[in-house]
Amino acid sequence: MTAVLFLCFLLICFSFTPSLQNVSESEPLVRFKRSVNITKGDLNSWRTGTDPCNGKWFGIYCQKGQTVSGIHVTRLGLSGTINIEDLKDLPNLRTIRLDNNLLSGPLPPFFKLPGLKSLLLSNNSFSGEIADDFFKETPQLKRVFLDNNRLSGKIPASLMQLAGLEELHMQGNQFTGEIPPLTDGNKVLKSLDLSNNDLEGEIPITISDRKNLEMKFEGNQRLCGSPLNIECDEKPSSTGSGNEKNNTAKAIFMVILFLLIFLFVVAIITRWKKKRQPEFRMLGKDHLSDQESVEVRVPDSIKKPIDSSKKRSNAEGSSKKGSSHNGKGAGGGPGSGMGDIIMVNSEKGSFGLPDLMKAAAEVLGNGSLGSAYKAVMANGLSVVVKRIRDMNKLAREAFDTEMQRFGKLRHPNVLTPLAYHYRREEKLVVSEYMPKSSLLYVLHGDRGVYHSELTWATRLKIIQGVARGMDFLHEEFASYDLPHGNLKSSNVLLSETYEPLISDYAFLPLLQPNNASQALFAFKSPEFVQNQQVSPKSDVYCLGIIVLEVMTGKFPSQYLNTGKGGTDIVEWVQSSIAQHKEEELIDPEIASNTDSIKQMVELLRIGAACIASNPNERQNMKEIVRRIERVTL
């Protein structure tokens, strides 16, 4: 009898052992919860002293109901720093799934979890480089999803040495360099996606020759190899003799010397020819930071001393000249190629070229049409001066007429220029400076305070404002093939209240056709790429790109001439919608607004309708704007 009772006691003890172990596993999970911020939903079911495997802990998976084997916490807006030390106390943890959150910073040291089999971190904001030996201590990894983050540097060689790796998704990052070869010991890899990075070189034969491997490399312009049907350039032979190398070096030196002499002579001749022509130049390196100033230099003919009795009359003359059509200024009439500033909009006051010359300027950047500078006038007015090249299709009088027309535009979402300066070789267009800069900067810049203010409500306000501005331009310039022609996030400026103002519009008639096709974003629409045609529907395509850019938070690769970097937002969106995965497109930073998911998805669908490859399948601007206006918070 005693033996029977003892046996029963042992059975009872063993039956409680897993439960006690489970309770002990609750502590590291609760510490993990406390280490991160949760902006969407909660993890209230995670409580110390309770069993994580009781089926009530959200996102916790257990092995045979006895020990924690997986953490699946997605779309909760998690941010902060993951403490891997807490997770080390979960000896049977095999899967970590934290995709579609707001996690940022360097990739945490998951290599401290040697038993890990699945690491799924898609659609976060992890950044920085990954050490080459990062995955050396995680030999059991089978699935690694790091796609759509901001990771950079080279792909870790240790990752491609995992013999059991079955799926690897790293698309939509900023990885560079060559793809490491896949270990010969790996016979199970079935899915590899490295698209939309900045990789280069030949795709390793250990990958390209694999059968039954689904692989994607699109969006890496410098990759080559059989999967892409792009031949690789032959590498130069390294077996040449020393004499051959010396002869080659001498030949190269002679060619360079000749070119330098030739360029020096050309520069002297050009300078001599231009001595008699007055010139407006903003000196400074094209890539100076915003904090560096540049000198504004004018020719001596402009900088004549002005006695005090004439200062007022000259200033008034500038204002009057601004209101005149003929544009006569300090350098003469239309035929001279050099005049004063011509005012087309005096709402912010009037100024002349000398006023602009006295202002210290800052380089803002270079665009497809030229460079931009910020200048602060003596009266405190901050302006942007755009120095535009190749805008020489129209004669002087026709150009003046167009600029006067721009100056009369009035709409809360359209930036009206203040003034312009005419030269045969280049034009200056002056407009009001917007302190919050462009939508491009706020979305993808330093991700500071302005970026943090891009809530769902603010993004909807921006999209609807851009749509209204485009509707206005399509009415004002209805006879133009491209009422805007260059709509992109860098040409959408933001006021203090995030009211968008569209700039750089209706330039097509001012540009030579070959310059327009290289400088204007509408010429990247499918109809021009395929059939060399543009229409107002091309503006609809550009609006769609902006809608999707704002809603996903991704930088479109379509903006880049080389195609290197960014996300192929057209392919990504169309593919996700076809698979009914629209919610996965939403920027995690606004996806926490669960009450508005339907409205966000509707806006994504409108954006997708704008980018249809066939322009006949796109609605016109007015219809698209009407749909956008119907979206509410």
Curated annotation (Swiss-Prot):
The chain crosses the membrane at residues 249-269. SUPFAM superfamilies: L domain-like, Protein kinase-like (PK-like). The protein kinase domain may be catalytically impaired due to the lack of the conserved Asp active site at position 486, which is replaced by a Asn residue. Keywords: ATP-binding, Disulfide bond, Glycoprotein, Kinase, Leucine-rich repeat, Membrane, Nucleotide-binding, Phosphoprotein, Receptor, Repeat, Signal, Transferase, Transmembrane, Transmembrane helix. LRR repeats lie at residues 90-115, 117-137, 138-162, 163-186, 188-210. The gene is PRK3. One of its GO terms (biological process) is regulation of pollen tube growth. The phosphorylation activity is calcium-independent. Its EC number is 2.7.11.1. The lineage of its organism: Eukaryota, Viridiplantae, Streptophyta, Embryophyta, Tracheophyta. Residues 1-19 form the signal peptide. Belongs to the protein kinase superfamily. Ser/Thr protein kinase family. It is a single-pass membrane protein. PANTHER family: LEUCINE-RICH REPEAT RECEPTOR-LIKE PROTEIN KINASE PXC1, POLLEN RECEPTOR-LIKE KINASE 3. ATP binds at residues 364-372, 386. It catalyses: L-seryl-[protein] + ATP = O-phospho-L-seryl-[protein] + ADP + H(+); L-threonyl-[protein] + ATP = O-phospho-L-threonyl-[protein] + ADP + H(+). This is Pollen receptor-like kinase 3.
